[in-house]
Amino acid sequence: ARGFNIESLTVAPTDNPRVSRMTIVCPGDDKILDQVRKQLAKLIDVHEVRDFSVEDRDIVDRELILCKIKVDPRQRSEIAEIANIFRAHIADVSPESLIVEATGSEGKIKALLSLLAPYNLLEVARGGRVAMARSLTPTPAAAPQTLSPVA
């Protein structure tokens, strides 16, 4: 089957204005992930497909989350303390709610959500994961372009 589920998709520009970098997270066994790699490689404008789950387990990956919480004045300091433990911060304050912003690994985000769950979570927005290998070799299409002075 050609169908597969995309758990997370993040797209952003690179230093090269003609190239964007995509991070796609797909759950599945080796057969499913092989199908994902093959389907992506067939796309005309794809420069390179890197599978961090196979090629390079030594990666740094992060996710962004925003949590809107309905609070009364007594709860503000409790939520601020929880945010501080996770090195998150209060991104917005209104008379009846707070928005907590955090970045981190999937495990850190899950742990933060579990501590915020007892509060009145109004809305949760999660950004897709981004990942980068720790090696010194950059992904060719995403590497910064060398600029030459114009004479």
Regions found by a protein language model. Name each.
Residues 1-21, 25-151:
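Long, contiguous binding/interaction regions
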